[in-house]
C-alpha cells in the first residue's frame, strides 16, 4: 500500500549512493538496491535517514505490517460469513476495504494517534459479521 511509494521516495538512487562503496566491497557484482531493500525500518539504510524521513518510513511500514497481520482474519471472517450471510459479508468487505484506506492515509499522514477511525470502522463490522454468522448458525442448529 503506502510503503512502496514511501520506500522509493526515501531510498532513491542519490540516497543509496552513499552505500555503494561498502556494498561493492562485499558484493562486487551488484549495486545497492534502490528502494532500500531489505531494510524494514531498523537496518543500516534507515539509520542514515533524518528523523522526519525515518518516522515517515516507519509509519508506512507499520501500516503495511498491520495489513499483513490482519489479512488472514479478514479473509476468514468474510469467507465463512459469505456462506451464511452473503450480502452482509459483501457489504462488510467493501466497508473494510474503505476503512483500510482511511486507516492507511490517516496513519501515514498524521501518525499513529490518528488511525482510530479507520481501525474501528474496519474491525467493528467484522466482529458484527462474526457474531451474526455464529448466531445464525447456532439458531439454525439448536432451534429445531
Task: Enumerate the language-model features and the residues they cover.
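Transmembrane alpha-helical segments that form the membrane-embedded catalytic/substrate-channel core
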Residues: 1-9, 97-104
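Membrane-interface amphipathic/juxtamembrane segments adjacent to transmembrane helices
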Residues: 4-53
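Membrane-embedded alpha-helical transmembrane segments of multi-pass integral membrane proteins
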Residues: 72, 95-103, 125, 129-132
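Transmembrane helix-loop-helix
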Residues: 83-95, 108-117
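Interfacial loop-to-transmembrane junctions
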Residues: 102-128
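Juxtamembrane boundary at the C-terminal end of a transmembrane helix
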Residues: 131-144
Amino acid at each position: 500500500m503506502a510503503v512502496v511509494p514511501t520506500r522509493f521516495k526515501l531510498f532513491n538512487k542519490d540516497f543509496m549512493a552513499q552505500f555503494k562503496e561498502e556494498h561493492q566491497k562485499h558484493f562486487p557484482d551488484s549495486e545497492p538496491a534502490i528502494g532500500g531493500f531489505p531494510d524494514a525500518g531498523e537496518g543500516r539504510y534507515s539509520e542514515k535517514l533524518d528523523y522526519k524521513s525515518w518516522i515517515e518510513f516507519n509509519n508506512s511500514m507499520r501500516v503495511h505490517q498491520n495489513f499483513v497481520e490482519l489479512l488472514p482474519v479478514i479473509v476468514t471472517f468474510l469467507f465463512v460469513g459469505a456462506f451464511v450471510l452473503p450480502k452482509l459479508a459483501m457489504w462488510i468487505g467493501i466497508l473494510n476495504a474503505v476503512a483500510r484506506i482511511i486507516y492507511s492515509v490517516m496513519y501515514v499522514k498524521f501518525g499513529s494517534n490518528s488511525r482510530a477511525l479507520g481501525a474501528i470502522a474496519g474491525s467493528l463490522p467484522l466482529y458484527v459479521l462474526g457474531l451474526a454468522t455464529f448466531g445464525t448458525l447456532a439458531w439454525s442448529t439448536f432451534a429445531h
